[in-house]
């Protein structure tokens, strides 16, 4: 997976010049909503943008593993924001802080009394090749209907 959109930039710039601010806002709303839906499904399936499963949980000190899928409530917390110049999809507040630890596999102290813990990388947000194709298809469909 790569978040590199360099090959799409010239195409997107030409399209951007043809649309007015209201049309750009509608397009950005449509793109962010569609991508949020895809990302929600992917998080619920416990997969990263590459399609690989998340790293499983480690055993605790007693030797048992917590039951249930990680990030069960997370899809509900995925937010979108858009205007004529941008479309954003991500998490806000404390959820964003926690997810950054998982996204990049950081080492933190879960609470003040515990030792530092290294979290494995569990990429929850990012663009897959399918997402890029979805963006292209949505833009084409939008332009055909305008």
Regions found by a protein language model. Give the residues of each.
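Short, Lys/Arg-rich flexible segments
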Residues: 1-146
